[in-house]
Amino acid sequence: GGVLEPVNATPVIIEDDVLVGGNTGVYEGTIVRERAVLASGVILTRSTPVFDLPNERIIKAEAGGSLEIPAGAVVVQGSRSVSSGFGKDNGLSIYCPIIVKYRDEKTDSSTKLEDYLR
């Protein structure tokens, strides 16, 4: 359950067999496709770019659309360096979610405990 705030906010959709780790936030305008894994501490919003390492691309929401996490993606929390000005001068970084791989047999065996607990 949840509340759409502001009124024009787009919903969150989490498809079947998604594993959501503790302290994870999935907010307005985010779609998580089936069998994805969101590791502990991952924060996803429509305005958050997601860095897909296996496919060497950046996933962003289209104007007015939703951020879509691909089916089977394994997403962890990460950071990227601030590349200009004060941030660069002080070695600052910004949070970013990173897809490190897509589900495989090893991932499935690691998440099997979740099935037993259901």
Per-segment meaning from a language model:
Residues 1-87, 99:
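Structural signal for interior beta-strand "rungs" in well-ordered beta-sheet cores
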Residues 90-118:
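C-terminal catalytic lobe of FAD-dependent flavoproteins
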